[in-house]
Amino acid sequence: MPGADRRVAWYQMSVVHSLDGKVVAVTGASGIAAAAARRFAAEGARILVLSLDEAECATLASDLDSLGAGHHAIPVDLTDGPATEAAFASGRALLGRPDGLFAVAGGSGRRFGDGPLHDATTEGWRATMDLNGLPAFHAARAAVRLMLEEPARGSIVLVASVLAQAPSPRLFPTHAYAAAKGGALSLVKAAASFYAPSGIRFNCIAPGLVDTPMAARAAADPDVIDFARRKQPLAGGMLDPAEIAAAALFLLSDESRMITGQILTVDGGWSVTEAE
């Protein structure tokens, strides 16, 4: 077999069912979270879905059941620490100890008045920070507590945003949201360093503008769509949630077993392209 063919064959074999036998918790049940849960299930994982929206949980659970048995969805308010711990405990009893966590749950703070710093209110800032920071914190804490059980192992992937690294002052001047997502970047670095000796990895994905329900306002704005075409040239517009799911699959799989404390920016070129 020619060398190139051997490399292709090895790659194809290595990624088939790359989550076989693993239990992966996903926070959120729409958009990126839903795409990821479906992809992980297709790759052989048993999925624990945790989300506030009961209807979305039920819909996603039904979709996952069509891909095979062994999945479970639990409606839970992830801003509530004890409720999150209880949900993870239930998931462990049903599916086993989690091998991975993909923490997606969060949202825009615009409804709380998020915008430029000089217009921000203390209440709006706190609400936006809680909406994005608490679900990631509570889920990561609950997951890592279970992953520390002997033999310790696991992979935790948080979702941040390109806005934490490459701002868009004209169209997305949402400073509380950027600060909250910046916190995810810092948490990943600190936690990765602390838990590496235990074999538990922490990484972060920073997506660009993705076509999700959270981005519905942006998707309906011709100015934003034109901006996205220029700012994300690899995508030619908004990113597909499946692109983020693919990156998460890599970080949760053993293919990335030597990677921790890293920020994987999946932005279609946003952070290296001028479009303002």
Q: What residue ranges belong to the model's regions?
A:
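Catalytic loop of short-chain dehydrogenase/reductase
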Residues: 107-108, 157-183, 188-197, 209-210
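Short C-terminal tail/terminal secondary-structure segment
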Residues: 7-14, 260-276
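Short, small/polar-rich loop/turn modules that mediate ligand/substrate recognition or access, typified
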Residues: 196, 201, 259-261
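A conserved structural motif in NAD(P)-dependent oxidoreductases
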Residues: 232-244
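Canonical Rossmann dinucleotide-binding motif of NAD(H)/NADP(H)-dependent dehydrogenases/reductases
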Residues: 17-48
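The beta1-alpha1 cofactor-binding region of Rossmann-like NAD(H)/NADP(H)-dependent oxidoreductases
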Residues: 75-86, 122, 242
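Substrate-binding pocket helix/loop in short-chain dehydrogenase/reductase
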Residues: 112-117, 121-126, 228
